Amino acid sequence: MVVGAAKVIAAGGVDAMSLRELAIQAGVPLGSTYHHFPDGKAQLVDEAVRLVGAQVTQLIEEARTQGTDTVLQVFADRWRRVLEVSEYAAGCPVAAAAVATDPRHHDVAREVFADWHAALTKALRDSGVPPKRAGRLARTVVAATEGAVSLARASRSSAPLDEVVDELATLVDSARTR
């Protein structure tokens, strides 16, 4: 159900997610959803956002040993797959939680973005970017990629992701101490 919730949130936002619909899709009684998620929809949304966050953090950490170009590409490719598989109907559920009507989800989105920031900062520092600059660049990577996901959805094209990755790679390369 958590994976299903993440998909619904990515496509329609937090408000589109319904426990009843997810229970029907999963083929489980509605009561069992409240057994597993006693805090209801809010808990399921937060767990879905944390799951996606952890998956992306793991991708960044695994790619770190292959260099920042690979890290940037892996980060963008994660969202490219989501966009293309959904025919550009879905984006990032973390971003959806960040702008949700219910402010309870903002804290979880902030935690996930902080995890991505930390993983990207480490990858950038490992590649020779000075520590202070690495933190700022990591935030730029997250912001630019999230923006590119929105642009890609609107244009129904992955071109914004490609352009952002190319520009970020140039920016990172120029930030390395030589």
Task: Give residue spans per PLM region.
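Helix-turn-helix
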Residues: G4-E47
